[in-house]
Design a protein with these regions (language model features):
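N-terminal, positively charged nucleic-acid-binding surface of large information/translation enzymes
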Residues: 1-237, 261, 278-291, 295-310, ...
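Core structural elements
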Residues: 135, 580-593, 614-622, 640-660, ...
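Conserved phosphate-binding loops in nucleotide/dinucleotide-binding enzymes
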Residues: 196, 277-280, 319, 356, ...
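Acidic, turn-prone loop/beta-hairpin segments
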Residues: 87, 179, 183, 189-194, ...
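Alpha-helical recognition segments enriched in aromatics with Gly/Pro capping
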Residues: 264, 292-303, 409-412, 416-421, ...
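C-terminal low-complexity, glycine/proline- and small-hydrophobic-enriched intrinsically disordered tails
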Residues: 576, 695-872
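Conserved short loop/turn motifs at secondary-structure junctions
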Residues: 5-6, 85-88, 116-121, 145-156, ...
Length: 872
């Protein structure tokens, strides 16, 4: 016979429970069909992780919160869609496959686009999507049979349709424009650039006037870009330079002449107050160039290699050229000085390459696309949790710039724009046979692909079949049920990457915001509040934590630490504590099982007959009300705190203890715990399932799962009975304190009395519980204070121990020893020493005075006790 474990062993049960529930289809839309209620629908979109990704602690937080909500709604009778999926992650995926090919000596350019894409699909089928399997270890109950991929056939068509609609409305245009350019990954949108503070230098360069005698000094952080200068610029109000406006200077090293212009854009206080204008390689200068009709000169190619505009420096890499340019400036006495200078430098969010402003012909989405969604947010048609995030959203949307959507990659959604030999340009959903304008059959498709965020911006509805053909797996069949989605849960770090774009993409195409509620959680940091990184060695691997502590412990911990708006400081101590919490509930079930083999479900308060059973159920009903309220308002940490306090602080610490007096309540306590496990289920799905069946004396293999049982609803309370038990608990705690104060061997307190601030109906119950749980032979309820007694004060009572018949000499001796010890501690503080008081640092003196105050308070209490004990 297999021996029952004495502690909870999550590794033995989690996989089995998950596989059974998944196999039965519980995670699917109709998995809870028997308890679904009419017109109740809930839809939650999983932020699609990169197909290259592995589960990290940030994913674990998002997925835990999402799954808690999905399980709660499923149990609460909602037809629930928790939509999983993967993002094709253009740059990241191409880089992974490209590296693998390079290891084999193959360049993607040698393969060509078509063959390279085949290789990517081969990699995706073999290795991509491992993260989906890893999610299952966490207990994620998404509808995995519906898993979507942003490069699915259906989603590809949705992307093309969105492009076509926006192109026809003039919201997508192609133009030469200043973009963020990564010499490795191509064009980037503004929010794909990460700025870092770097220690650099300000180079003060001499630009000689045409007379070659006088010169102007210009400060720049990028001397290598001087070859692209089209002008020098000063503020029109700067008296130092007014007389020079309109004259020309000679460009250092290459002797091209450029004009001196005036513009209020110049800050007179920065550097020398005279700046170089490089329209081809600076965002601000690009705008200045347009205002003043200056030439835009590009000095390097897409790979960052300097071109013929740079004279002798042609063919040098842009960053490597800097030192050589500075060296040549020094040789020609054109460098006035160099100063240290700290400034913000943009880097590619993927490869960390230094990003360049670069004029390039790209495709853009106009900012006007977002106007309607902005207005609807202001009208309150979608709510942010925490509410302060709307301010961040508004601030960003006010500064919205054209969104560069073209990327110079092979992997991704190829832009559906075709050009014929007669230069007619058009958009097509399918591969066209000829040009609709001139019927030419010589067509070329745009070689660029769309920004990854373009397809993920459609995620809220493209996954539901929008724009897809009837032959596709999903063809708008679910839009009427699940669009708009109900809730979005994600990290605040992708508010602008993804959330804002989903808002305007969805509203623009469907006329309605994609979700009603937007919950943005904080970041997970280490226990010191520092960002996790491999270099610091403080990364917490969720899969390792699941293996060590169990998925339930990790889920519960992350939810518990997710206080609104605050970063999460995670440590293994938290995980250990919540593993102990799971074990505490396990032990409570083991205790109940020793008393009785199985327990029935009792959902209503009126089904409970014993005072303890009714009290426990009444308390559970209050917690049910509070947990529901917390979940409905995305206060995950409040919900977990409520459950922890009830299950450990009330059920295990009190109800189990009370049952040792009121044994006939065991049956009803088992029923209360079964209901509490349903309440706990969304947070800790595995242990709640396991222990529920243990209490039922059933097995999941042969019976229904807790996850498709109704979530507790009843909130009826017996407040009078609750108050009576709160008084009883207070009396027991007070009596225990009294015993601790008095009992010094051989003194043993056998009798005590209780005075109540207000009467309760059943004092006999109080006496019975108090005698048993405070371990006293007799407890009397009185209305007066005994003459010679010591007392303890509780919230609802005052308890007394009569001293008349006790030999108090051991206790008196103990208290006198404590006084002697306190006296020695006072002397150690040195406050009686005048020299110390005179010379000690103020902080040391203040600390000593605080310590003395504490010692004097203790001394006063002990003396009061001695006075009472020694009175005749």
């Amino acid at each position: 016979m297999k021996q029952e474990p004495t502690t909870y062993q999550p590794q033995e049960i989690e996989k089995k429970i998950y596989e059974i529930c998944s196999h039965r289809g519980y995670f699917e839309i109709n998995g809870n069909e028997k308890i679904q209620e009419k017109n109740k629908r809930f839809c939650l979109m999983m932020p699609p992780p990169n197909v290259t990704g592995i589960l990290h602690i940030g994913h674990a937080l998002t997925l835990s919160l999402q799954d808690i909500l999905a399980r709660y709604k499923r149990m609460d009778g909602y037809k629930t869609l928790y939509q999983p999926g993967l993002d094709h992650a253009g740059i990241a995926t191409q880089n992974v496959v490209e590296k693998q090919l390079l290891n084999q000596g193959i360049k993607k350019e040698d393969l060509g686009r078509e063959e390279f894409i085949k290789k990517v699909w081969e990699w995706k089928e073999k290795s991509g999507g491992a993260i989906l399997e890893q999610m299952k270890h966490l207990g994620v109950s998404a509808a995995f049979s519906r898993t979507r991929f942003t490069m699915d056939k259906g989603l590809q068509r949705a992307v093309k349709l969105a492009f076509l609609k926006w192109y026809e409305k003039g919201l997508i245009v192609q133009d030469n424009y200043m973009v963020n350019w990564c010499t490795k990954d191509g064009a980037l949108s503004d929010i794909e650039v990460e700025y870092e503070e770097r220690k650099g230098a300000l180079y003060y360069i001499r630009y000689y006037l045409e007379n070659q005698k006088d010169y102007l000094v210009v400060a720049t952080t990028r001397p290598e870009t001087l070859f692209g200068d089209s002008a020098l610029m000063v503020n029109p109000n700067d008296e130092r330079y007014k007389h020079l406006v309109g004259q020309k200077v000679i460009l250092p090293l290459i002797n091209r002449t450029i004009p001196i212009i005036a513009d209020e854009h110049v800050e007179m206080e920065f550097g020398t107050g005279c700046v170089k204008v490089t329209p081809g390689h600076d965002f601000n200068d690009y705008e200045v160039g347009k205002r003043h009709h200056l030439e835009t000169i590009k000095i390097f190619d897409e790979k960052g290699i300097l071109n013929a505009h740079c004279g002798e420096f042609e063919n040098l890499e842009r960053l490597k050229a800097r030192d050589k340019v500075v060296e040549r400036l020094k040789e020609n006495a054109l460098l006035e000085k160099i100063e240290e200078h700290t400034h913000q430098v943009g880097h590619c969010y993927r490869c960390h390459n230094v990003v360049e402003p670069y004029v390039s012909k790209q495709w853009f989405v106009k900012p006007e696309i977002a106007q309607s969604s902005i207005e609807k947010i202001q009208q309150g048609l979608a709510r942010f949790y925490p509410s302060n995030w709307i301010n961040h959203y508004n601030a960003w949307m006010r500064e919205l710039r054209p969104w560069c959507i073209s990327r110079q990659l092979f992997w991704g959604h190829q832009i559906p724009v075709f050009t014929c030999e007669n230069n007619h340009q058009f958009v097509s959903l399918d591969t066209p046979l000829n040009c609709p304008t001139c019927k030419s059959e010589k067509l070329e498709q745009d070689k660029d692909v769309l920004d990854t965020w373009f397809s993920s911006g459609l995620w809220a509805f493209s996954t539901l079949g929008w724009g897809q053909e009837k032959s596709d797996l999903f063809n708008e069949s679910d839009l009427k049920d699940f669009y708009p989605n109900t809730t979005l849960i994600t990290g605040f770090d992708i508010l602008f990457f993804w959330v804002a774009r989903m808002l305007f993409c969805s509203e623009s195409l469907l006329g309605e915001l994609p979700f009603k509620d937007i919950y943005l959680h904080a970041l997970v940091r280490d226990e010191k509040g520092e960002k996790m990184s491999k270099s610091k060695g403080n990364v917490i691997d969720p899969l390792e934590m699941i293996e060590k502590y169990g998925a339930d412990s990790l889920r519960f911990t992350l939810a518990n630490l997710c206080a609104t708006g605050r970063d999460i400081k995670l440590s293994t101590t938290h995980l250990e504590n919540n593993k102990n919490f799971a074990n505490k509930i396990f032990n409570a079930v083991s205790y109940l099982k020793l008393k009785q083999e199985s327990f029935k479900d009792k959902e209503r308060l009126n089904e409970y007959q014993t005072p303890l059973g009714r009290y426990a159920k009444s308390r559970l009903n209050l917690v049910t009300k509070e947990v529901r309220n917390a979940l409905d308002n995305y206060r995950f940490n409040d919900a977990t705190t409520l459950l922890y306090r009830f299950l450990w602080g009330e059920f295990c610490d009190w109800f189990i203890e009370f049952s040792k007096v009121e044994n006939e309540a065991i049956d009803e306590l088992g029923s209360v715990l079964k209901e509490a496990l349903k309440l706990l289920h969304p947070f800790m799905p595995f242990i709640s399932e396991f222990l529920y069946h243990k209490l039922s004396n059933t097995d999941l293999e042969n019976t229904c799962s807790i996850m498709i049982m109704p979530y507790p609803k009843e909130i009826a309370q017996d407040e009078k009975l609750e108050h009576e038990f709160e008084v009883i608990k207070d009396c027991i705690v007070s009596l225990r304190r009294l015993k601790i104060m008095l009992e010094t061997p051989p003194i043993v307190l056998k009798e005590a009395s209780v005075g109540l601030r207000e009467a309760i109906e059943n004092t006999e119950r109080l006496q019975t519980y108090a005698q048993k749980l405070a371990r006293l032979e007799k407890v009397s309820v009185i209305t007066y204070k005994p003459l010679k007694s010591v007392s303890d004060v509780g919230e609802f009572c005052q308890t007394y121990a009569n001293l008349e018949n006790l030999d108090l000499s051991p206790l008196i001796a103990r208290l006198k020893k404590q006084l002697e010890k306190l006296e020695k501690e006072k002397l150690k503080l040195n406050l009686h020493n005048e020299n110390f008081v005179k010379n000690a640092p103020k902080s040391v003196l203040e600390k000593a005075k605080e310590s003395l105050k504490t010692l004097l308070e203790k001394e006063s209490k002990i003396k009061q006790e001695l006075d009472l004990l020694e009175q005749p």
